[in-house]
Amino acid sequence: MFPITRRQALAASGGLLTSLLAPRRFAAAAAGGTLNIAYNVNLPSFDPNTGPSSVNPTLQSIYRSVFNNYIGQRPDLSFEPALLSAWGWNEDKTKVWMDVRNDVFWHDGSRLTPEDIVWSIQRNAKPDGGNPVSFIWAGIDNFKIDDKRITADVVNYDPVLFKWMAFLTGYVLPKTYFEKVGPQGFEAKPIGSGPYMVDAYEGNAYLRLKAHPKYWGGKPPFDTVVFKFVPDATTRVAEIESGASDLTLEVPYEEYDRLKGKAGLKGVCKPTCDLGLLFITNGGVMDDKNVRLAMCHAVDKQSIIKRLLRGYGTVIDTLEGPEYAAFDPTIKVPFDPALATKLLAASGYSKDKPVKFTIQTTRGFKPKDYEMIQAIVGMWRNVGIDANIEVYEVAKHFELRMTHKLAPAAFYNWGNYIGDPTTSTGFAMWSKSPHSAWHSDDLDAKITPLWAEKDEARRIQGWKDADRYIAEQGYVLPLLQYAQPILYKSDLKVTHNTSGALLPASLIEKA
């Protein structure tokens, strides 16, 4: 399936990338049923269930093209059948049941079975198996298979177990094939049950997919889909403007406004589940509550949205977007530079004697991410905070976050497309989560009981209370809910996906 090895691909990426970006070649390919996407991140791994890449929301567009989730999700975030045709709990929520489709085929032509479902869950549940949220999957065990129905005992109750089956690491892999080739063999030649099969891959350059002829969801609209890895936003703009790519995303908003009405192009820019935030890592100067709160009150979020993002975006003060189940509009952390100055003065800091620390950010991963951090650093400087900017790739962010080595402040885009507070505030702020930066016992005491709360109203209120406490303590700095800018050729029809995932098989088609 792969003409060259990944190592060879990395070595040769420069030359082949040049040929991939040639406009004439891709213009001709598009006419023949190929969709070319200038994508904003690279693909570090083909395993959608293990390692840091598995919890990167931006990669889900690719993973959901090659693999299938247990449970599907519509553009409005509601759930629908996928590999599971039905699912549920028993009355006292001590058992779960799942019915498996009988018309699903892997890319190698073999049939998907309930054993694949069980094996995938058990693999995810292994504490040393590399799944970043293994404890979620370890919540059910003692599986039994009767024809197409699977039953299991609930070992540790998790109210969002089935939501996770449509979320990060919730993918089913082929048991027989994976055990035959092993993890390295799977990386070299991955297969799934999704609408597209991997046809060719060149590290840091592109991924080419071809339609799965036996896909249970019907024939995909494009014979071939090419994800071109273009982390630089300026280059993505050039890709769509020159016609080298048919579609791109996460371009600067001024470029979106300029190009959306250009002949031959269209655009869509609507809110997604992506939240821009600054992680705050405990330790050093961040252990000072006055410093943390000053950081929060010194940032004029609305000004950033208006001036840098051309009005695209919504101010947030918690890690819950307006579409999330635990969103509470009464929790506010207002822009108040006078209060920020007063708080810093109480800890002995001023413009002449500023508190100093490093802030990390990506550059081009999200529209104006670096420029936004520059603006924030300027606002901080006005009240007595001197922050040094360090730029990194998003993959480095995951590496540092999972080892609790982020800088005192670090920009990130948090995606939570199931809208539950456990997958926003929970995983971002609970110290036992590998995705949290702030670790403290006082916050854990408020969050820990909520994981197993069976009363839904009490559970949601508990998360709202935790969000309020976090805001009062300044444990994280939420910035904004993003609107996702997508530009595409006018002969395409693109359906906005609130999750932010671009899905060539279902939400992109020929007009």
Where are these regions (language model features)?
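A structural "hinge/loop" feature
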Residues: 41-60, 83-84, 110, 161-170, ...
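Surface-exposed binding/hinge segments that line
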Residues: 88, 99, 133-177
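Append "and occasionally in soluble cytosolic enzymes with long acidic Gly/Pro-rich linkers
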Residues: 208-213, 261, 287-378, 382, ...
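N-terminal lobe/hinge region of extracytoplasmic solute-binding protein
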Residues: 38-91, 122, 189-193
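Detector for C-terminal structural segments
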Residues: 15, 26, 202, 268, ...
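Gly/Pro-rich hinge or "lid" segments in bacterial periplasmic/extracellular proteins
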Residues: 64, 74-78, 167-220, 224, ...
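Ligand-site clamp/hinge motif
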Residues: 212-258, 386
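Aromatic- and charge-enriched surface segment that lines or borders ligand/interaction sites
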Residues: 86-130, 151-153, 239, 285-286
